[in-house]
Design a protein with these regions (language model features):
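Conserved small/polar residues in nucleotide/adenosyl-binding loops
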Residues: 211-217
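Juxtamembrane/start-of-transmembrane alpha-helix segments at the extracytoplasmic/lumenal side
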Residues: 198-207
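Extended, hydrophilic extramembrane loops/domains of integral membrane proteins
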Residues: 169-195
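Flexible loop/turn segments at secondary-structure boundaries
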Residues: 37-39, 181-182, 193, 203-204
Length: 223
């Protein structure tokens, strides 16, 4: 927690992790080719004069097309025993470095069995992929049409050549105590990335707000 500026100094000095617990957590990962038909509208802004004032007007145009993308290692967590946002904070993993399972790899560590099945996991993966495809298509439209806005975007995606892998990924779990409250954190056993909650120093937050908030003079100057 040394890098957490808002964390109280005393917490940094007194925080001592309890025994680390090493565990292999279950994940599904999916590869697929996608083909997405899309249609929507893009807008271009222009400035017009209305009397003594200038106004921005947006002209809207229809657009449609097909977007293709290959999805590689879309990761879905298959455990329900841990805080999901904390687990997401550990990503990404270097899934391209996975190895075929051997009992000796997990010897001495706990290994959880999946709680999210393959079918459910693929639906979750598709929701995540859909979000990424929407962002990519919006960016494509803005670039190709030199557009300022995109709206009413509708997607229809087909998946083919879908493959999956079942992975056990290494995580270290621990916690520390500060002012009678226990704070849990996790460490990505592959990359060392840390995820978890830390206490907040209210005085530090106030100082930050005072330094970043505009002064009355700033408000007056901006009018």
């Amino acid at each position: 927690i040394k890098k957490k500026w808002f964390c109280p100094k005393l917490a940094k000095e007194s925080a001592k992790a309890k025994r680390f617990k090493g565990v292999y957590l279950p994940y599904w990962t999916f590869d697929a080719k996608t083909e997405t038909e899309y249609r929507g509208e893009y807008g271009k802004d222009r400035t017009v004069r209305n009397g003594d004032k200038e106004e921005t007007v947006t002209d809207w145009y229809p657009t449609k097309g097909v977007y293709r993308e290959t999805i590689d290692d879309e990761l879905v967590c298959a455990t329900t025993n841990h805080n999901q946002s904390m687990l997401q904070g550990l990503e990404p993993y270097r899934t391209e470095e996975n190895k075929s399972y051997k009992p000796e790899y997990v010897a001495g560590f706990a290994a959880e069995r999946y709680a999210v099945g393959l079918k459910e996991a693929f639906q979750m993966a598709k929701e995540s992929i859909k979000f990424k495809l929407r962002e990519a298509i919006e960016s494509k439209i803005r670039t190709e049409k030199n557009a300022d806005h995109v709206k009413n975007l509708k997607l229809s995606t087909r998946y083919y050549d879908v493959t999956y892998k079942y992975l056990l990924l290494p995580v270290w779990i621990s916690s520390y105590k500060y002012k009678d409250k226990v704070y849990q954190f996790m460490v990505n056993g592959q990359t060392g990335k840390v995820s978890g909650k830390t206490p907040i120093s209210i005085p530090k937050v106030i100082i930050c707000l005072l330094y970043t908030s505009p002064s009355p003079r700033d408000y007056a100057a901006s009018r």
